[in-house]
Design a protein with these regions (language model features):
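Conserved pre-ATP/AMP-binding loop-to-beta segment of ANL
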Residues: 5, 20-21, 136-144, 154-176, ...
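Structural core segment of the AMP-binding/adenylate-forming
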Residues: 51, 78-149
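AMP-binding/adenylate-forming catalytic core of the ANL superfamily
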Residues: 90, 96-97, 261, 372, ...
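Conserved ATP/PPi-binding loop(s) of AMP-dependent carboxylate-activating enzymes
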Residues: 343-347, 356-388, 424-426, 519
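AMP-binding/adenylate-forming catalytic domain of the ANL superfamily
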Residues: 484-506, 522
Length: 667
């Protein structure tokens, strides 16, 4: 591999001379040859400078995958600015936070999820970002035709001056990590890193690479951007569609006979299930680049079995590495491609490291660290102690893995995803690989959940193939033959589908929230079945205690959605009981304890004291309070234990089909 000190502008100028009429990008009828792309981006870059955008200014780019998106991206960089790539699936408020985080001064936008719901979404984003309307430009095909720039006579000398002296290693791109904190990290990438990472990645399959690719990866994410950059560098043709839908992808492959494809596992699975897959996809596709989360061996083998003429190439990386760090090759065996994430890219370094032992030997597990030409320039506006590249230049990925004797990288988990159960470290990936071997399982994700005894429990989320049923007992029996008993999931949660991020990757945080909610519901159901004790209050035998107790119970009754009328009735019954025990007891009752319990059918309020046994229906002097209590309770009973302690229970059934488990699970 030859590392190149080059830029997008120099690549375009070269290709415009070598193959001017070859189509570079095409999406939904908007196609640009290399000569057109070079000319149009020069003109647009000049206009961008005319908008008042200066070198190194941060400029936001927001829209679905399309040729015009890439035209705008190239033009921003040709103008010497920094392209801030926004996720087309995020709501306006979240985007405004990212705009503020990165100090973006201008918005270029096209069609996206928000504008499809609200035509004023871009205006609202500008307002939230404190930008005037003249700091916005709509590049969508419906709003603007870049082909008009082919006849534009604007002076592009300022652009030429910038591109001729442009430093390939400067900050040129900001891409956001899909983090779990309130705000993602803003990763600063260079043209040098993205272009050379693409070259290194492409070298892994250069002899098998076709003349065109159907790219389904979002270009606002590093993998999608790197792939299209590679195909641009090699003068290939990139086909796109705004919406990553199976029917649209099938149309592209069928129409243009694209031999190469790029996508995440969910996209390939959806294509397999498309009715025209056999006649419109299989005949053309030969190379399938797969990104996103790590593919299990069984999953990748199943896909390759379905794509009968294609080879699936697995890889690994992260945004901070532009992003690829390793990649498999078509000449690798299916076993190697399925069980590893490929061998290292030429020119880069990967080692396995632990804090305790330093660099590890072949086959030993530790954190994957990387060093080389593809690394980011850093996180924007984060101090040194929060950067993930150490003083020796090693990027700490946060992923666990090992390198085998053939120099292939194997991932065993993510440090933050490791489940710690009773002091044992458990890798979710190990369990997932065994679960997915079951023929009924389409997708699986194993996660940890808080547990009061073992610290964490092992929980599995699964998606079934259509028409398949899940036998949990059989699955557990099967797993007992493959993994240690303590690693077997406590529960299997079945989903119709997993939530996805805008780039098609699994929304792991969203899935975990759903799983934890369902787990909470299961645990609540167990507690509610036996009676869930939620409050105990003890008061003196004094009429002054009545009001605060009523206030407590009234507030609680309203909180759990009893109607105002029913709440008043509950309070009347409680008041009658308190007054009877406090004011009219036959003997000294001492302190009174009031407890609230929740059951599936009702709320139970219990009163306990040392007074004489009290049957409201038998005592002549308690008729009025008895009538009040019996009028409003759903059930009533009184008991006395062996020590002579009396307990009076009043049940109040839930209203209008209210489900206490669902209610508490949402809290």
């Amino acid at each position: 591999m030859t590392i190149e000190e080059t830029t997008y502008a120099k690549i375009l100028a070269k290709k415009a001379k070598e193959c001017p009429d070859r189509v570079a990008f095409c999406s939904e009828g908007q196609c640009y040859t290399y000569a057109e792309l070079d000319k149009i981006t020069d003109v647009f870059a000049a206009k961008i400078i005319g908008f008042g955008i200066k070198k190194n200014d941060h400029v936001a780019l927001w829209g679905y995958n399309c040729a015009n998106w890439f035209v705008t991206y190239l033009s921003i960089i040709k103008a010497g600015a920094v392209a801030v790539l926004l996720n087309y699936s995020l709501p306006v408020k979240d985007l405004a936070d990212l705009m503020e985080l990165t100090d973006a001064k201008f918005i270029f936008y096209g069609n996206n999820r928000e504008t499809s719901k609200d035509v004023d979404a871009a205006v609202k984003l500008a307002e939230l970002s404190k930008l005037s309307k003249d700091k916005m430009f709509n590049f969508s095909g419906e709003a603007f035709d870049f082909k008009t720039y082919l006849n534009d006579s604007i002076d592009t000398s300022a652009v030429k001056a910038i591109t001729e002296s442009d430093n390939p290693r400067r900050d040129a791109i900001i891409i956001f990590t899909t983090g779990t904190t309130a705000l993602p990290k803003a990763v600063l990438l260079s043209q040098y890193g993205v272009i050379n990472d693409g070259i290194g990645y492409g070298d892994k399959y250069k002899d098998a690479r076709g003349e065109s690719i159907c790219n389904t990866l979002p270009m606002f994410h590093s993998f999608g951007l790197m792939v299209v950059t590679l195909y641009l560098h090699d003068a290939k043709t990139v086909y796109l569609h705004e919406l990553i839908k199976p029917e649209e992808i099938v149309k592209i492959v069928d129409k243009y006979h694209t031999p190469d494809m790029s996508g995440v596992g969910a996209v390939y699975t959806a294509l397999v299930e498309h009715p025209d897959f056999d006649i419109k996809v299989i005949p053309s596709v030969r190379i399938c680049l797969i990104g996103g989360s790590v593919s299990t061996p069984a999953f990748l083998m199943r896909l390759e079995e379905k794509f009968t003429h294609a080879t699936f190439l697995n890889g690994y990386g992260q945004t901070e590495a532009s992003p690829a760090l390793s990649m498999s090759s078509p000449t690798d065996s299916i076993e190697k491609r399925a069980t590893s994430v490929g061998s290292l890219l030429e020119g880069g370094e990967i080692k396995i490291w632990t804090k305790e032992k330093g660099f590890m030997s072949t086959g030993e597990v530790g954190e994957v660290v990387a060093r080389g030409y593809y690394l980011m320039n850093g996180y924007y506006k984060l101090p040194k102690e929060k950067q993930s590249i150490d003083d020796e230049g090693w990027l700490h990925t946060g992923d666990l893995g090992y390198v085998d004797e053939d120099n292939f990288l194997h991932l065993t988990g993510r440090i933050k995803d490791i489940i710690i159960k009773s002091g044992e470290n458990i890798s979710p990936i190990e369990i997932e690989q065994k679960i997915i071997e079951n023929e009924c399982i389409k997708e699986v994700k194993v996660m940890g959940a808080p547990h009061p005894v073992t610290s964490e429990s092992v929980e599995a989320c699964i998606v079934l193939y259509d028409g398949k049923t899940f036998d949990e007992e059989a699955m557990i029996a099967e797993l007992k033959t493959k993994i240690s008993k303590f690693k077997i999931p406590s529960h299997f949660f079945i989903f119709d589908s997993f939530p996805l991020l805008g780039n098609g990757k699994l929304d792991q945080r969203g899935l975990k929230e759903l799983m934890l909610k369902r787990l909470k519901k299961l645990r609540l159901e167990h507690k509610i079945e036996k009676g869930f004790h939620v409050n105990t209050t003890t008061v003196d035998n004094d009429e002054l205690a009545v009001t605060p107790v009523l206030g407590l119970i009234g507030t609680f009754a309203k909180e759990i959605k009893f109607s105002e009328k029913r709440t008043d009735q509950i309070l009347e019954a409680v008041k009658a009981m308190l007054e009877e025990r406090i004011l009219n007891a036959y003997t000294d009752v001492g302190q009174i304890t009031i407890q609230i319990h929740l059951f599936k059918e009702c709320m139970r309020i219990q009163f306990r004291d040392q007074g004489d046994k009290y049957f409201v229906e038998d005592d002549e002097n308690a008729k009025n309070t008895a009538k009040t209590i019996l009028k409003y309770v759903s059930n009533y009973k009184t008991e006395k234990d062996s020590k002579g302690v009396s307990t009076y229970s009043m049940d109040f059934n839930w209203e209008n089909g209210f489900n206490i488990v669902d209610f508490l699970a949402d809290k």
